[in-house]
């Protein structure tokens, strides 16, 4: 189990660095003479047609609806494993990161709404600062090497996974529109068949993959966001087969490199290209921008810390062995690195809004996430010992 966690953390760390490169490249292209080529490439129409089935979308939406469904499939597999056998498999293990994650979602949303109370049309973005980017956060933490206690990394990992689960619920409840009953019925039948396969002990991934594709198309056409299909598929794939092997973990290990080194960097490259042409210092004072920055930079750490502190004081949870509040505080700041998931929610929230809203959101996400990364890194570096020695609680 410890080796699996270390492998996961090392991949996520490398992914965080690759994400930064993808963001930088997108920003350079969006603000260069090649900006038109960059935008035109993302707007390229891509069509999939089989009989009466016709899916015709710009490349950007194929990335956001298709590739990100695979990313959410991976998140679903991780959540299921952690719930059944890992860091969230008991009340004692799950209490602190679960309670901390709730605070880390509630407070950023409140901060955002506080800055957008006078503009109802922008309030739809309340969930944007509620997310934590697991790859970026672990990537920043990894820069400190073995100075970081494994228990602290696992705490951040568990908190971020629960955070992702919360984001999935938010997307399902608040960002699904114009529902098609026919598509929902097809989706329901697909789910029932996958559950039946699970109950029958079918461990081959192929039938789940075929039914999963049907589910993805049905959800895509239903008005519910297509990425949720990935999570549903994950929860239907058995964790343990009759012969003791784990189809779920096998698929998770297969997907991890693709997610880390292809899916998330491609998503970042496609969504982070913020043109600064029309941006001024006044852009930072826009309610959307300010709400997101304050939500990520203040709302996240305040929520995580306050709820963690109350949970410990009320004896609902305990700090991990060898970990003190001086460690938790900078990690709470790092939770404000919301990049990938925040950009994704922003693309849903402002899908039918003026383009400027999306630009302000990306400006807020990039600024807030960068500041959270820098402050969290230097703060954690200051409280950790110079070498990977024994960590004492203070």
Curated annotation (Swiss-Prot):
The keyword Membrane applies. One of its GO terms (molecular function) is sodium:proton antiporter activity. InterPro entries: Na/H_antiporter_dom_sf (IPR023171), NhaA (IPR004670). It is found in: Cell inner membrane. The chain crosses the membrane at residues 17-37, 59-79, 95-115, 124-144, 154-174, 177-197, 213-233, 261-281, 287-307, 328-348, 363-383. The keyword Cell inner membrane applies. It catalyses: Na(+)(in) + 2 H(+)(out) = Na(+)(out) + 2 H(+)(in). Disulfide bonds: none annotated. One of its GO terms (biological process) is regulation of pH. Keywords: Antiport, Cell inner membrane, Cell membrane, Ion transport, Membrane, Sodium, Sodium transport, Transmembrane, Transmembrane helix, Transport. HAMAP family: NhaA. Belongs to the NhaA Na(+)/H(+) (TC 2.A.33) antiporter family. This is Na(+)/H(+) antiporter NhaA.
